[in-house]
């Protein structure tokens, strides 16, 4: 019996959405996409609230299953469409390393990114304590630099869900606070950009930049261009 097609409610300006889109592209999953415009408040429409009371994207519907967190969605899709693969390792300790970094992304990195972005949208860039947020996000850079001391990827020698989750948020933070002072992180980011699946991050990232410029009057630093150079 064939599986029902997953339905992903999304706004690609959201970093967690983009991590799901990267996995979908990487595994070539046939998914129905339904756009929810966060900046127009479509997540508060009655039909969507009935589906997801958290009024957030991504939201995945797969048969009778409804998932409202990107990390749960990543795990679910990997278990369904990458069975036996290395994105969500089979060995317990390795899987827990990946889970630990998924939780780092949602509770530490993305939270700090979201705090800054939300303040900029609500208050306008001129009224935000940018230095405070830069310190908080630089701390996240320092932590990730340490994660990469002994491995090429965040959770070990191979690409995992942790990398897909982290790279979309990091690429957003890099627009605002370039990571040029962190060589291991730059090397990892460059490697991630060379994946075919990274293309699924690019459109939403640019749309977010444009939205922040227009809504929050955010002044992006001139050095915030996406890292493209080879790092030896």
UniProtKB/Swiss-Prot annotation:
Lipid metabolism keyword on record: yes
Residue ranges of domain GST N-terminal in the record: 4-85
Catalytic activity annotation: RX + glutathione = an S-substituted glutathione + a halide anion + H(+)
Disrupted-gene phenotype: Embryonic lethal. Embryos display severe developmental defects such as poorly differentiated cuticle, failure of head involution, abnormal gut looping, and defective mouth hooks and dorsal closure. Trichromes are absent. Embryos have a higher sterol content. Embryonic lethality, defective epidermal differentiation and trichome development can be rescued by supplementing embryos with 20-hydroxyecdysone (20E), ecdysone or cholesterol. RNAi-mediated knockdown results in larval lethality at the second instar stage, which can be rescued by supplementing larvae with 20E, ecdysone or cholesterol.
GO molecular function: glutathione transferase activity; steroid Delta-isomerase activity
EC nos: 2.5.1.18
Keywords: Detoxification, Lipid biosynthesis, Lipid metabolism, Steroid biosynthesis, Transferase
Short name of any one Pfam family annotated for the protein: GST_C
Family: Belongs to the GST superfamily. Epsilon family.
Task of the protein: Conjugation of reduced glutathione to a wide number of exogenous and endogenous hydrophobic electrophiles. Essential for ecdysteroid biosynthesis. May be involved in detoxification.
PANTHER family, per the entry: GLUTATHIONE S TRANSFERASE D10, ISOFORM A-RELATED (PTHR43969), GLUTATHIONE S-TRANSFERASE E14 (PTHR43969:SF5)
Record protein name field: Glutathione S-transferase E14
Organism placement in taxonomy: Eukaryota, Metazoa, Ecdysozoa, Arthropoda, Hexapoda
Gene: GstE14
């Amino acid at each position: 019996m064939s599986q029902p097609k997953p339905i992903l409610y999304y706004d690609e300006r959201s970093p967690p959405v983009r991590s799901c889109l990267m996995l979908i592209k990487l595994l070539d999953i046939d998914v129905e996409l339904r756009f929810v415009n966060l900046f127009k408040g479509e997540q508060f429409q009655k039909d969507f609230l009935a589906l997801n009371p958290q009024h957030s994207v991504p939201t995945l519907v797969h048969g009778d299953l409804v998932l409202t967190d990107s990390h749960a969605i990543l795990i679910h899709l990997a278990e369904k469409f990458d069975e036996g693969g290395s994105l969500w390792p089979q060995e317990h300790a390795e899987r827990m390393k990946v889970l630990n970094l998924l939780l780092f992304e949602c509770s530490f990195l993305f939270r700090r990114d979201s705090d800054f972005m939300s303040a900029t949208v609500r208050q306008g860039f001129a009224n935000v304590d940018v230095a405070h947020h830069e310190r908080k996000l630089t701390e996240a850079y320092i932590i990730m630099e340490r994660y990469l001391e002994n491995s090429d990827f965040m959770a070990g020698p191979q690409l995992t869900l942790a990398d897909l989750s982290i790279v979309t948020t990091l690429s957003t933070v890099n627009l605002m606070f370039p990571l040029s002072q962190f060589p291991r992180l730059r090397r990892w980011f460059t490697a991630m950009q060379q994946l075919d699946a990274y293309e699924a991050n690019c459109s939403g990232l640019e749309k977010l930049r444009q939205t922040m410029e227009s809504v929050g009057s955010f002044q992006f630093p001139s050095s915030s261009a996406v890292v493209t150079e080879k790092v030896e």
